[in-house]
Amino acid sequence: MGNTLGLAPMGALPRRSPRREEPLPNPGSFDELHRLCKDVFPAQMEGVKLVVNKVLSSHFQVAHTVHMSALGLPGYHLHAAYAGDWQLSPTEVFPTVVGDMDSGGSLNAQVLLLLAERLRAKAVFQTQQAKFLTWQFDGEYRGDDYTATLTLGNPDLIGESVIVVAHFLQSLTHRLVLGGELVYHRRPGEEGAILTLAGKYSAVHWVATLNVGSGGAHASYYHRANEQVQVGVEFEANTRLQDTTFSFGYHLTLPQANMVFRGLVDSNWCVGAVLEKKMPPLPVTLALGAFLNHWRNRFHCGFSITVG
């Protein structure tokens, strides 16, 4: 007879495998929610500063800083840092020990430990000569799509005073992160708590972040126009101080000239800018900054040299 078509039974037809969704990313730390926007703004500069960095080994480095200013006496700082062998990312190495001591004997120290694959611990100490000012202990757990942190600040069992801070962040989508912060403080005759809600939305070229609570609000917007230009906008309102500030920051990178420019304008009539210039092949970076507050009629400028 004629040709016949061999048809496969319905059950034998190939099926499309279900599309696997990518797992949600970890939202990171609560303290880093506004980091991208803050990195756009220039740091305050005043006086003359010389910084000499020296790498002693793959694990240990030191830095010497001399600062001279018209607002105070000259100062010297010795900075030392130790980094271990366990590197989780280009910016995360465990254990890490960092210390900074000035000419008056005051010390700022920080210790970072990786207790388990997802559990991290941090201890911070600050002294003024022979007196302890601050001691703080942090524990952070990073899940697949969430981060939980608990902080104890200045715990004093005898004086019955303590500051407890709890953070939680959850990735709802690849772009949206929601969470909150609870700050509890207690000392003799006083006790209170402040709750703050937080949200962050990340697009391809911009990031918007908002913190709202009984203590005030903090909103930031970061936009990367291209490889050279970044801008940031910040809004901060403090209900206790009855103060509101609006700031605009500008970041310009000129790779061919080895220069970086940062500028700011805020609602307090303050204008400032910092220009950094690298001097290859020498390991030297020059920085020049100036800030003017029109409302208070204050002007200060600074110059720094970083070697290494």
Swiss-Prot record:
Answer whether the UniProt record assigns the keyword Oxidoreductase to this protein: no
Q: Which GO terms describe its molecular function?
A: protein transmembrane transporter activity
Q: What is this protein called?
A: Mitochondrial import receptor subunit TOM40B
Gene Ontology terms: biological process: protein import into mitochondrial matrix
Q: What is its main location?
A: mitochondrion
Question: Which keywords accompany this UniProt record?
Answer: Membrane, Mitochondrion, Mitochondrion outer membrane, Protein transport, Transmembrane, Transmembrane beta strand, Transport
Stretches the record annotates as Disordered: 1-29
Q: What subcellular compartments does it reside in? A: Mitochondrion outer membrane
Q: Where is the signal peptide?
A: none
Topology of this chain in the membrane = Multi-pass membrane protein
Look up keyword Transport and say if it applies. Answer: yes
Give the residue ranges for region: Required for mitochondrial targeting.
281-308
Summarizing the function annotation, the protein's role is: Potential channel-forming protein implicated in import of protein precursors into mitochondria.
GO CC annotation terms, alphabetical:
mitochondrial outer membrane translocase complex
Q: Family per UniProt?
A: Belongs to the Tom40 family.
Q: Which domain of life is it from?
A: Eukaryota
- What is the protein's quaternary organization? Forms part of the preprotein translocase of the outer mitochondrial membrane (TOM complex) containing TOMM22, TOMM40, TOMM40L and TOMM70. Interacts with mitochondrial targeting sequences.
